Amino acid sequence: YIEENGVRREVAAEDIGYVLSTPTVPEFLTGREFLKFFVDINSDSIRDPRPLDEYFAEMSIAPEDRDKLLKDYSHGMKNKMQMLVNIIAQPNILLLDEPLTSLDVVVAEEMKNLLRSLKDGRITIFSTHILDLALDLCDEIVLLSHGELEVVEKSNLDDHAFKEKIIAALKEESHA
């Protein structure tokens, strides 16, 4: 359930945004065409419509890249486009699969700052194998091991035995 303005309701499809670890964008379109298409088909639900170039600037997508085909974008640029449509849609729940995988240092830092800015007013859930990233960005951490979820107390993360437990779980997962 989601609670808005004191009213509890069921989660709807439009409440959820998703960013894949391997960006999935229509590679036959330019960045501008894709963004325009997204804005046009979602015009009724976009709360704060702005000119396309403002959206691109918010994600640090250079003017010379905006009219290139998405197939010519780097992994990081495609990831930015996925994030951008979710920023525009403003879902209540944002699901991110390994959001910093394969990103260069600059884009990864931009994404971390963006994720920090998106925390207010929504639920952001992401998967990661990077413990430091979880520590940096998350209010709560949950470990998935053997199909079971276990809440991780941040205070335990300084405990050597607890770190060993997490590393052992990750090793088992990589051999499964």
What are these regions, as identified by a protein language model?
Residues 134-136:
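A short, surface-exposed alpha-helical micro-motif characterized by mixed small hydrophobic
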Residues 108-120:
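Helical segment within the ABC ATPase nucleotide-binding domain
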Residues 121-127:
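Conserved H-loop
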